[in-house]
């Protein structure tokens, strides 16, 4: 995607106009000057503010929301770190190099090696800091993994309250610094533009507060305002896939991308898009709302059903143990969509497939919810569901032959029953992702860079704004979004030079 095309929708933020505004304000008055202006009070912005303030920096922290925390309010808060004190106390020998090797193995070497190296090298320091200040992981942690491809060593942690367990620690530390008078917090204050000088260096921000605009100047401007998961138009434009489910943080609107691109930054990472293996949504709206999820993890429930795409074809063995393999198999299916097909004998005998539902709840939903279809024959079931009838009939017949001879065409092992007794059932599953795969390009010092690799002076970025694909590649690697965001925010707060008065 060309930069010219991307910024067409935000031409009002173009560099010349913003530079002119900077010059007019500079002539008119001398506003407060901060050491740090941090745009976004979430997973990366909070540690940046805390650590900068602890050094004596004067910090302005801005957020469009009405509370600090960002996606930590919704996140599972999964972290990964190697060489932590908790690991040592439990006799677990681990290193950042082993962590790095695992990330590259799981991502098939698609994660950015520079940012990933920084993330794993800094992870233990970040995690130990949280633990020292009261973070409590679940008692059995660390673990190898859950919901994502497992690590080779136990380095995966989260708290009982998910992301809020992390936020509770950050909020306490943040309030200490705010009450000390070194952090100026402005909530419900979106940033409308970055201010640049004639040389292209970022000097401050323009904000909207109520019905009026203000400008603030600072030595370092940090963009930590998250991704674009709740901006359906930007999601499709950048990721190349539709935003099928509205399950993200409502303020993840891509504001940081617009701000950075308007002053010369660019986006990268489109090739790393990956969907999860699907959910049941409330309706056909795009984006839709989450309703439930069929248990498709064989470690939790062995499959009795078959999974078919819109052509009625199976596309992966249903008892495939690798979640990464399942997720990648869905990328090539039309609309990231598939159906879970079974019959009355399976519904009666198998453990209920929809997570948290009883068999009776499932029965009551067929014929009521559009994504739950039943019919007395496979052809009718297919037509009502949106599946090719001939394809489905052919697939079920082939599967049943495999059950009879004890050998499946795709290598599936668990095949307790054929699909033969009417009525027949189909439940639609929709793949989706709420994380921002694409993000703003930065260098090894987290400076926002132009396409020629040169840094934009005084402008930095961290968190999901960098794109999930930078530290995960084309995979979902456990803990490699939350922990890098925390660590990169901490690094920026610790290491950027301060003005002489601080």
Question: What is the predicted function of each stretch?
Answer:
Residues 216-284, 482, 488-491:
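Glycine-rich loop(s) and the adjacent beta-strand/alpha-helix scaffold that form part
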Residues 119-212, 218, 232-233, 280-282, ...:
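Conserved redox-cofactor binding core of oxidoreductases
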Residues 391-473:
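A glycine-rich dinucleotide-binding beta-alpha-beta segment and adjacent secondary-structure elements
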Residues 257-259, 263-385:
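An anion/pyrophosphate-binding glycine-rich loop and adjacent beta-alpha core
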């Amino acid at each position: 995607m060309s930069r010219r095309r991307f910024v067409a929708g935000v031409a009002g933020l173009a560099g010349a106009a913003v530079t002119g505004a900077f010059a007019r304000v500079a002539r008119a008055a001398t506003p407060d000057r901060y050491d740090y202006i941090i745009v976004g009070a979430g997973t990366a912005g909070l540690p940046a503010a805390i650590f900068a303030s602890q050094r004596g920096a004067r910090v302005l922290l801005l957020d469009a929301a009405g509370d600090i925390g960002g996606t930590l309010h919704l996140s599972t808060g999964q972290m990964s770190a190697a060489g932590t004190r908790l690991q040592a106390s439990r006799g677990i020998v681990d290193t950042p190099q082993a962590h790095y090797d695992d990330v590259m193995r799981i991502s098939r070497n698609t994660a950015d090696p520079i940012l990933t190296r920084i993330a794993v090298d800094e992870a233990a320091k970040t995690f130990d800091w949280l633990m020292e200040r009261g973070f409590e992981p679940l008692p059995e942690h660390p673990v190898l993994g859950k919901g994502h491809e497992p690590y080779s060593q136990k380095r995966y942690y989260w708290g009982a309250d998910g992301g809020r367990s992390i936020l509770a620690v950050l909020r306490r530390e943040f309030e200490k610094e705010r009450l000390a008078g070194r952090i100026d917090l402005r909530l419900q204050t979106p940033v409308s533009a970055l201010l640049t000088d004639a040389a292209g260096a970022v000097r401050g921000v323009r904000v909207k507060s109520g019905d009026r605009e203000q400008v603030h100047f600072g030595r370092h401007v940090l963009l930590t305002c998250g991704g674009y998961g709740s901006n359906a138009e930007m999601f499709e434009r950048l990721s190349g896939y539709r935003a099928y489910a509205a399950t993200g943080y409502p303020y993840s609107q891509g504001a940081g991308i617009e701000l950075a691109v308007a002053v010369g930054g660019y986006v990268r990472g489109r090739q790393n898009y990956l969907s999860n293996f699907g959910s049941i949504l409330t309706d056909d709206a795009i984006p839709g709302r989450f309703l439930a999820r069929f248990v498709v993890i064989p470690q939790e429930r062995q499959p009795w059903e078959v999974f078919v795409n819109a052509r009625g074809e199976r596309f992966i063995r249903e008892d495939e143990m690798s979640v990464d393999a399942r997720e990648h198999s869905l990328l090539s299916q039309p609309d990231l969509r598939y159906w879970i097909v079974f019959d009355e004998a399976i519904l009666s005998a198998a453990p209920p497939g929809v997570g948290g539902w009883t068999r009776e709840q499932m029965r009551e939903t067929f014929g009521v919810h559009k994504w739950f279809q039943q019919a007395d024959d496979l052809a009718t079931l297919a037509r009502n569901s949106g599946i090719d009838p001939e394809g489905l009939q052919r697939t079920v017949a082939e599967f049943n032959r495999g059950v009879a001879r004890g050998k499946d065409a795709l290598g599936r092992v668990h095949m307790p029953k054929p699909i033969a007794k009417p009525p027949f059932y189909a439940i639609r599953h929709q793949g989706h992702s709420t994380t921002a795969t694409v993000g703003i390009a930065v260098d090894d010092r987290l400076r926002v860079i132009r396409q020629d690799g040169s840094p934009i002076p005084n402008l930095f970025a961290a968190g999901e704004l960098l794109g999930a694909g930078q530290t995960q590649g084309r995979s979902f690697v456990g803990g490699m979004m939350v922990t890098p965001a925390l660590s990169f925010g901490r690094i920026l707060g610790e290491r950027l030079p301060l003005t002489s008065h601080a």
